[in-house]
Structure formats: C-alpha cells, structure tokens
Amino acid sequence: MRTLHVGLHVADLDRSLDFYRAVGYEVVGHVPETPLGHLAMLKLPGDDFVAVELVHAPGGGAQHGGSTGLSHFAIQVESMDATLVNLAARGIDAEAPTSPDGSTDFRTTRVIDPDGNTIELVQWPAGHAEGLSAADWPT
C-alpha cells in the first residue's frame, strides 16, 4: 500500500489554484463534474504523480457540508477484495466498491476513521502507473 494523494475542500478554486501554483505546484488536470464537486489535480515539478486534489463544491457538494479543509486522502491497495476482508476482520466497515470506468480492475471505496475523516482506497487496473499522472487527463 502507498498514499496516493490528499484531497482538500476549497472555498474559491481560482484563489486556491493561484496559491498552490505560487507554492510551486503544477496543475495536471481537472475533473469538472463529480459527486464531490470540481476536482483540480496538482503535482510538484519533478514528481510524476498527483499529490494534492483540490475539491471545489460551491453548493456544498453531495459528499460534504460545504466547509473547507480535508476532503480525504487516498491509499493505493494491491487487491480491493483482500483489503476489504482484512478491514472487516478488524471491525472496519467500508462502502461497497465502485468502478469509475466500469471495469473490474479499477475499483475505489471509502472508509471513515474514528474522527470522521474519509480515506479513499484505490485498486488500479493492471499496468496503470503507481499514481495519478497527466496520462489520466488527456488534453
């Protein structure tokens, strides 16, 4: 397993993009319409993979109460099925996995920690890079 990225809810996407660009991040791509809101993916120069996901949901979004701060962080898992069995054995409930692309290889789910923080679990399809990269957002 490895940490993939941290998601942050932001009140003003343009302002936040300006800030993170000034810090040194580069915009890798955007996913404008998701249940979470508009997503902007950022990475540092020299890194191959996304490290920060800015989440902008002006009306609060379907998944969040409209405040700013941590949205979630994501962990890559080798096997979603094995991970879910392991979590269940430890008394940790997970949402039913979904597949963003409709395949059986690319699966995601969420668990909630004791303080209410969301952790996204991601199983990449075979051959996918070890993180989100520019290839995930063709221009």
List each language-model region with its residue ranges.
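Short, charged/polar, Gly/Pro-enriched secondary-structure boundary elements
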Residues: 47-51, 116-119
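Vicinal oxygen chelate
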Residues: 2-12, 30, 40-44, 62-139, ...
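Core segments of cupin and vicinal oxygen chelate
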Residues: 2, 9-49
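A short local loop/turn or secondary-structure capping micro-motif enriched for an aromatic residue
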Residues: 59-63, 127-130
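Generic beta-structure capping elements
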Residues: 45-47, 55-57, 124
